């Protein structure tokens, strides 16, 4: 969520920066709600002051033995104030809730270093890394035989989309034997690298979260249609009550679309000691996405799935050091690809292509020879205080005062897409797949996967 103080002090700058993201901020609605909030708050404070003054006046009148009629007149005014104050407080809470709803739908402001642009066509390539020779286009040289896509390569090795479709429908995969082992090896390697070399603490997190958690990290309310909602069976439909028998509100639950949600929420509604920053957390989890709006795209294979695995990296950083942390995290994701000997490039996203909560994002794109193109395999973002403000995540600064942390997240990596990249880049003319050296210890010493 954006800083309300910034909106009040420098609204036009905020509007201009949002416009660079293709977002038109509703100035009229904001001004209407803000004016109402100020008026109601001023009136509330005035009535509270009047209540206190009347209480003092009643004491003084009684103390000096004023006539009963005079005392009763002041008491009558005092007794009428609670109802008026309750109405004002309710109106203030309602207005503040409407303001919060408005701000919850507004994306983060782009950092000054983010290039202006309307779409992915205007993203900027920062660098690329190739493990071998390049052709005249600056991409990996041809393999020297007819390239097959990961579906054709993977099916003889245990990748089964037909069975997955019978079990669950479209956009799911079933793996057995060598393929399942390679998928597991990739995840284990990524976790070991992030924990053993890069200093992240491994976490095991829930796969189901409450809606309030998703509001904190920014998935709700904007991306509700992209989430899988959890429907409980058994007796959970019975209404819950508190100790007095009053019905309790039932909070919706969802499957996580990324473990960024659970890892970042570790600091929700907490104040971290400044000396403990940065926190580096990682987890390997399945991720669940409805892929609303992506019908017809990437329907073949594992590129766009309803369920996929990912090793996530999260850092909770001091505001003064968060952009150093961002570059560090990009390097951590790059190292995975380098050790797997997979060609990739780093792209700085333009203002129009960034995610909702991001102030600055780098995408890592891996080369897929069968598609003759680069495909995203990791996205690393600095959200600054955007998530922290929503979830009230703070640290104590040098003056021992609470201040919002900066939150960063990134894939280290998407396991399924890494599997796709290995199958396509490491395929051999006879249909076998060369196992990258770094994965061989996780594969029992296997150097080649053969149909």
UniProtKB/Swiss-Prot annotation:
UniProt subcellular location: Cytoplasm
Gene Ontology molecular function terms on file: ATP binding; serine-tRNA ligase activity
Residues engaged in binding ATP: 289-291, 376-379
Keyword check for ATP-binding: yes
Source species, domain of life: Bacteria
Catalytic activity line of the entry: tRNA(Ser) + L-serine + ATP = L-seryl-tRNA(Ser) + AMP + diphosphate + H(+); tRNA(Sec) + L-serine + ATP = L-seryl-tRNA(Sec) + AMP + diphosphate + H(+)
Biological pathway: Aminoacyl-tRNA biosynthesis; selenocysteinyl-tRNA(Sec) biosynthesis; L-seryl-tRNA(Sec) from L-serine and tRNA(Sec): step 1/1
GO CC entries: cytoplasm
One of the GO BP terms on file: seryl-tRNA aminoacylation
Enzyme Commission number, as recorded: 6.1.1.11
Residues that coordinate or bind L-serine: 258-260, 312, 411
Family classification: Belongs to the class-II aminoacyl-tRNA synthetase family. Type-1 seryl-tRNA synthetase subfamily.
Protein name: Serine--tRNA ligase
Organism: Bordetella pertussis (strain Tohama I / ATCC BAA-589 / NCTC 13251)
Encoding gene, per UniProt annotation: serS
């Amino acid at each position: 969520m954006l800083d309300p103080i910034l909106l009040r002090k420098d609204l036009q700058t905020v509007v201009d920066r949002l416009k660079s993201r293709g977002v038109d901020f509703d100035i009229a609605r904001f001004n209407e709600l803000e004016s109402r909030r100020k008026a109601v708050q001023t009136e509330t404070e005035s009535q509270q002051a009047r209540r206190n003054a009347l209480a003092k006046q009643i004491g003084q009148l009684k103390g000096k033995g004023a006539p009963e009629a005079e005392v009763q007149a002041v008491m009558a005014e005092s007794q009428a104030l609670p109802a008026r104050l309750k109405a004002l407080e309710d109106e203030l809470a309602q207005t503040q809730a409407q303001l919060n709803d408005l701000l919850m739908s507004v994306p983060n402001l782009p950092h000054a270093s983010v290039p202006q642009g309307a779409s992915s066509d205007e993203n900027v390539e920062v660098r690329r890394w190739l493990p071998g020779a390049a052709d005249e286009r600056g991409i990996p040289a041809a393999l020297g035989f007819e390239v097959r896509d990961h579906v054709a390569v993977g099916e003889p090795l245990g990748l089964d989309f037909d069975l997955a479709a019978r079990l669950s429908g479209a956009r799911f995969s079933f793996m057995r034997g060598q393929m399942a082992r390679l998928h597991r090896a990739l995840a284990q390697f990524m976790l070991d690298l992030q924990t053993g070399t890069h200093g992240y603490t491994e976490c095991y997190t829930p796969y189901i979260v409450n809606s309030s958690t998703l509001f904190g990290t920014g998935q709700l309310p904007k991306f509700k249609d992209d989430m899988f909602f959890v429907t409980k069976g058994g007796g959970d439909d019975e209404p819950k009550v508190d100790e007095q028998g009053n019905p309790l509100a039932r909070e919706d639950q969802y499957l996580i679309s990324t473990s960024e949600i659970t890892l970042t929420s570790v600091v929700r509604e907490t104040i971290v000691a400044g000396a403990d920053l940065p926190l580096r957390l990682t987890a390997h989890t399945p991720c669940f996405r409805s892929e609303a709006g992506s019908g017809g795209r990437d329907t073949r294979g594992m590129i766009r799935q309803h369920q996929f695995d990912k090793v996530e990296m999260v850092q909770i950083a001091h505001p003064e050091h968060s952009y150093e942390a961002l570059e560090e995290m990009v390097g951590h994701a790059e190292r995975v690809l380098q050790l797997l000997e997979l060609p990739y490039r780093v792209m700085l996203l333009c203002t129009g292509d960034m995610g909702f909560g991001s102030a600055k994002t780098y995408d890592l794109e891996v080369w897929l020879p069968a598609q003759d193109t680069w495909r995203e395999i990791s996205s690393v973002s600095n959200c600054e205080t955007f998530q922290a403000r929503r979830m009230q995540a703070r640290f104590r600064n040098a003056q021992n005062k609470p201040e919002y942390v900066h939150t960063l997240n990134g894939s280290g990596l998407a396991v399924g897409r890494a599997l796709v990249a290995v199958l396509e880049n490491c395929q051999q003319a006879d249909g076998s797949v060369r196992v990258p050296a770094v994965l061989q210890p996780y594969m029992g010493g296997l150097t080649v996967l053969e149909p």
